[in-house]
């Protein structure tokens, strides 16, 4: 929570500096069947972190969001200042800003580490030698393939499918500000309002099957599409007959617990392995960058949950 809050401040600073409005303050609505232990911990964490939020009961929720079928939902948290980062364009903005500040950006495939101990350099498959004092590898779902000898059984890349539904012409109920970004806790489903006329987004947060990110099909499956249609019809009745106008297939990249991985390569102490971002690593990017830099420079204590030693070969998801 602290990292998310800190990162949003830095994302906004970047977007202001590059003059690109890549954050939509839609608000985020967290929905749950009832107020239990997990909900209490969430409220306490938000309070400690100074995050602005309000609590809604069933009646308040139904009155505020009549377009949502709130059956069996008796508790909700609304964060008015949260929202949606436009990921692809934000990454491009980071690269452009880094170039302006003197960084180099290259697209290349590296070969294996060529020597024991500290890695002095890496050779790309094109024959270029890249030398540095420290190397950081944040390869997402490909991290387990790039360092298969260490991470093949510790990184779990799963198939995740996303769908966008058309909204009725002239109907603003499914666009911000009438519709916030939302998440149903027990259903493990989340979505976003219609942004930039792309449609109403829905995705399932359950982990899909383990896949190879290089070879998995990028076409959405009929089964997942039908699951999305069924859910939308139940929770958002006005979209019951709306067509799917776009679909995407991507990956989550999890460790056994769902915690991040930030640690040295066990055989090459100047090579850092950074991963386990799941579906939320991007939004934590600024805080993660600060932490990794602090680790390399020896300026911040290591978080035990991020260590390589804490990762197991069997998934026991604890972080969502």
For each predicted feature, which ranges?
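Dinucleotide-binding Rossmann-like beta1-alpha1 core, especially the glycine-rich loop
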Residues: 1-64, 73, 188
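Short beta-strand to alpha-helix junction loop
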Residues: 2, 30-38, 77-96, 217-224, ...
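Active-site substrate-recognition segment that forms the wall
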Residues: 13, 19-24, 134, 141-270
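Glycine-rich, N-terminal phosphate-binding loop of Rossmann-like dinucleotide-binding domains
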Residues: 33, 139-140
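A short, glycine/Asx- and small/polar-enriched loop/turn
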Residues: 38, 67-73, 114-121, 254-258, ...
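Short loop/edge segments at beta-strand edges and connector loops
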Residues: 57-58, 106-109, 246
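Helical element adjacent to the flavin cofactor pocket in flavoenzyme catalytic cores
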Residues: 78-126, 130-134
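C-terminal catalytic lobe of FAD-dependent flavoproteins
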Residues: 231-320
């Amino acid at each position: 929570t602290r990292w998310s809050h800190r990162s949003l401040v830095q994302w906004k600073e970047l977007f202001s500096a590059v003059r690109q409005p890549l954050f939509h303050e839609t608000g985020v609505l967290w929905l749950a069947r009832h107020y239990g232990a997990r909900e209490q911990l969430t409220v306490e964490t938000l309070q400690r972190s100074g995050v602005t939020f309000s609590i809604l009961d069933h009646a308040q929720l139904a009155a505020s969001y009549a377009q949502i079928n709130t059956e069996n939902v008796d508790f909700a948290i609304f964060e008015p200042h949260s929202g949606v980062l436009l990921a692809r364009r934000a990454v491009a903005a980071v690269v452009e800003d880094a170039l302006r500040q003197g960084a180099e950006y290259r697209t290349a495939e590296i070969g294996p580490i060529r020597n024991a101990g500290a890695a002095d350099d890496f050779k790309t498959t094109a024959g270029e030698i890249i030398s540095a004092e420290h190397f950081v590898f944040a390869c997402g779902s490909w991290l387990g393939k790039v360092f298969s000898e260490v991470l093949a059984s510790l990184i779990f890349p799963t198939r995740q499918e996303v769908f966008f539904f058309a909204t009725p012409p002239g109907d603003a109920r499914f666009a911000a500000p009438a519709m916030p970004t939302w998440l149903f806790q027990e259903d493990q489903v989340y979505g976003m309002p219609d942004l930039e006329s792309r449609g109403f987004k829905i995705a399932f947060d359950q982990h899909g099957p383990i896949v190879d990110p290089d070879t998995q099909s990028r076409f959405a499956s009929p089964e997942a599409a039908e699951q999305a249609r069924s859910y939308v019809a139940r929770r958002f009745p006005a979209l019951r007959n709306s067509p799917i106008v776009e679909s995407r297939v991507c990956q989550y990249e999890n460790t056994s617990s769902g915690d991040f991985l930030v640690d040295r390569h066990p055989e090459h102490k100047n090579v850092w392995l950074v991963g386990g971002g799941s579906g939320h690593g991007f939004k934590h990017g600024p805080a993660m960058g600060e932490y990794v830099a602090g680790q390399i420079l020896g300026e911040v204590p290591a978080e035990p949950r991020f260590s390589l030693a804490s990762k197991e070969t069997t998934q026991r998801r604890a972080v969502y």
